[in-house]
Amino acid sequence: MAATFFSGFKDEQSALAFLLEQIYEGFQMQSSICVVLKDEKYFDEFKKAQQQKYFEKGKIEYLYDKNISLLDSKPADEFDEIHILSDKVLELPTNVCENVYVYTTKANEGITKASRELYANLKKNNFDLSHQAV
């Protein structure tokens, strides 16, 4: 079980654009992917970012989302990957996923604070943790 924390995004748009780049491989492998977003505004921004990536890259995969579950709370089902840009996930059960990716922005202190608490809880559960400043 591994978790990677990405920090340093100036706003949610830049975090969502990076998140889409990260899950692009999941589209290819048909992985089951969970994306936990803060609220309805973030859901709308995610959909806009998908379309923007499609127009930038010209790859239809950015519009395919049948293997993506969009949630606004802690996931209960098992997934191949979980991507979190939310202040509502403070812990995860060890059986829910092998690969967790957490994104924080300078613009949202609530998400940053929640990710710190999630980091501490995942460490207690023996996740292999890494951090990348973007």
State what each model feature region is.
Residues 1-15:
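Glycine-rich phosphate-binding "P-loop"
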Residues 3, 32-34, 81:
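Residue-level preference for the first positions of well-ordered beta-strands
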Residues 8, 36-40, 84-88, 105-107:
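Structural motif
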Residues 16-64:
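Short, well-structured hydrophobic secondary-structure segments
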Residues 45-46, 93-94, 112:
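Short glycine-/acidic-enriched loop or helix-start segments at secondary-structure transitions
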Residues 57-72, 129-134:
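A generic structural motif
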Residues 64-100:
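Mid-chain, well-packed structural core segment of small domains
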Residues 99-134:
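Glycine-rich, aromatic-bearing surface loops/beta-hairpins
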